[in-house]
């Protein structure tokens, strides 16, 4: 994974260049994260997409059936497999902001099997890795392992999180969006 040396393929739009509705998203992101991620500065070129993605990510990565910090670590792990330094950095920061420890963040980026995770959390990371290779790897045998430790809502969130972070790093890398400072 290497950072971007070149300019983004689509310009980053600053707050004074966007509609009031998108400015509201920028304000919410700034309040929540302390920064407006560069991905949103590119998505702002298509307001309906920026609004939809913001709503999707808020509902996906917030505390729900699974804790937000864990879903951010899943996003970090998948982003690492996608070789997206931007997404690894962004989701490591979000995991930290939502309560993940530095040891957990480091383990999610490395040997999670030896990390400070429950067996269920390790199984979730294995699920993300299998899904990354092929959805067919979530076969009946593996799915029965998930069902043994996760509720249906948790399984849906786990798979949706892992699947979503197959998309976002690809978007970022294809458009050469620079890592948010």
Over which residues does each language-model region extend?
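Hydrophobic alpha-helical segments
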Residues: 1-181
């Amino acid at each position: 994974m290497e950072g971007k040396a070149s300019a983004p393929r689509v310009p980053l739009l600053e707050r004074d260049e966007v509609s009031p509705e998108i400015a509201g998203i920028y304000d919410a992101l700034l309040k929540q994260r302390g920064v407006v991620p560069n991905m949103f500065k590119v998505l702002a070129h298509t307001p309906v997409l920026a609004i939809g993605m913001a709503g999707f990510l808020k509902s996906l990565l917030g505390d729900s059936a699974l804790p937000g910090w864990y879903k951010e670590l899943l996003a970090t792990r998948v982003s690492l497999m996608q070789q997206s330094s931007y997404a690894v950095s962004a989701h490591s920061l979000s995991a930290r902001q939502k309560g993940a420890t530095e040891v957990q963040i480091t383990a999610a980026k490395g040997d999670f099997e030896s990390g400070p995770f429950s067996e269920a959390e390790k199984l979730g990371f294995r699920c993300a890795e299998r899904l990354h290779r092929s959805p067919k790897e979530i076969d009946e045998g593996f799915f029965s392992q998930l069902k043994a430790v996760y509720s249906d809502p948790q399984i849906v969130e786990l798979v949706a999180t892992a699947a979503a972070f197959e998309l976002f790093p690809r978007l970022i890398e294809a458009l050469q969006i620079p890592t948010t400072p």
